[in-house]
Amino acid sequence: SQGVKNIFYPCMSYNIDEKLGDNNYNCPVVAYYPEVIRSNVGELKKLNFMNDYLGLHRPKDFSKKIYGILCNKFGSISFDEVKNASDKAYDEYHNYMKKIHHKGLEYLKEAIENDKPVIVLCGRPYHLDEEINHGIDKLICECGATVITEDSVSPLVNKFPTGVLDQWTYHSRLYAAAKYVAKLADKDVNIVQLVSFGCG
């Protein structure tokens, strides 16, 4: 009813490798849900539903792969434009992750200096949705604690043995954040893991 003709919803087996785990898989729901939707939503047959397999984890190959997908669906387009857009997207992703890391460390330092409790709030990307997290981050802050995310501290930890097959990107972040928090045992820093839908 809204005139949508194209839906781009790629399957992505792998996440960007953060060098924390034995592998860097996306969970099966994230990776393959487009297949489930394509097979079960008949209306999609009337649209250009693009659920090709794509890998963000290999920047050197990404431009060629997305270029092929776009040309196949939309005809001739400029590889240089696709490559330029891809490079800018990766640059922005890395800049964004640096900002999260720096802001988290800024809040952590300020809280420790002011003897405030800190909660490293671990969750999956969908926990950013207030309909799913129910404002738990705000509630924790209202109780007087500073909240930072697991991806703000996980880069401070090198890969380490976990005793499990550590192949999921978000679990790797969780383990790294927990290890970092454990190093701060003399500080009032704790970790809370959000779990929804039976994930994890």
Regions of interest found by a model, annotated:
Residues 1-200:
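An N-terminal assembly and electron-transfer interface module characteristic of large anaerobic redox
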